[in-house]
Amino acid sequence: GIAAAWGVVLAARSGDDLPTAIRGLRASRPTAVNLGWALNRMQAAMGAAAPVDVDALIGVAAALQQEDRLLTQRLVDHGVSLLAQGCRVLHHCHTGAIATGGVGTALGVIAAAHARGLLRHAWLDETRPRLQGAALSAWELGCLGVPCTVIVDGASGLLMRRGEVDAVMVGCDRVAANGDVANKIGTYNLALVARAHGIPFYVCAPGSSIDRATVDGDAITIEERDAEEITHARGMDVAAPGAQVWNPAFDITPAHLVTGFITEFGVLRPPYREVLSELLLPNQL
């Protein structure tokens, strides 16, 4: 959402047609709800007057970034309270500082747990096909001196079976009114494996990612991406010639697999439909 807000600022500075630019930004990530929320804030700042006040747009984008910095810190503080001394946490995709306006969400919790002497080890799914875990999460935790190991996505079951994981923490792109979660492809599999091994599965969800207008996960649009993300690696064709590819970027984790939602408001527990309905959310003020 923050990146989209600054995208509107750049479009305004360049003299681009702003309604066209906003439509393009909105269509770029249909699964994530906070992108639309941020664009709505920018549209409200534009008003009906012409020419557009670029300084006003800059002010709104900067405010969004500052709000995110503060709320992610609150979210992280709530998340760390769930972790015991010597914990080992498994993470999927990337939810760190370079993905937010602050310290990050799930990865921010892991980093804070390390800083407070609680974390024993972080396990990072490589997160196929874009490898956000291997490329981004491992880099960010490495910069912070957090002990971490990258694993292939399919290794999580064996890791849990061996008793090497105490909690799973992930982020989210959208949470439906009933608590169903849209997140990076592979999240659903991870939640199922965690449930099979009795390991808590936590979703870090800023209020701007909670969408009470979407009744459940079946109503969430799942973005599908280019086949080459799967058929090619570092520019080299690695798939059989003519292989058919299905490449959804996200999946839906049913609410009953979520142990708790870590938010800036606190840790939310079931029943999710009732609990989520009572929140005062930034995207519905």
Q: Which functions belong to the PLM regions below?
A:
Residues 25, 29, 60-70, 95-99, ...:
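Flexible, glycine/proline-enriched loop segments at strand-loop-helix junctions
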Residues 34-90, 120, 124-168:
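Ligand-binding beta-strand-loop-alpha-helix segment within the catalytic cores
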Residues 103-115, 191:
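Histidine-anchored nucleotide/phosphate-binding helix
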Residues 1-49:
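Long amphipathic alpha-helical segments
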Residues 119, 125-285:
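Conserved phosphate- and dinucleotide-binding cores of soluble alpha/beta proteins
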Residues 73-77, 105-109, 150-152, 183-186:
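Active-site glycine-rich loop that binds ribose-phosphate moieties when present
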Residues 3-7, 36-38, 90-94, 169-171, ...:
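Short beta-strand segments
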Residues 1-4, 34-35, 94-102, 247-262:
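Conserved phosphate/anionic-ligand binding catalytic regions in large, soluble enzymes, centered on
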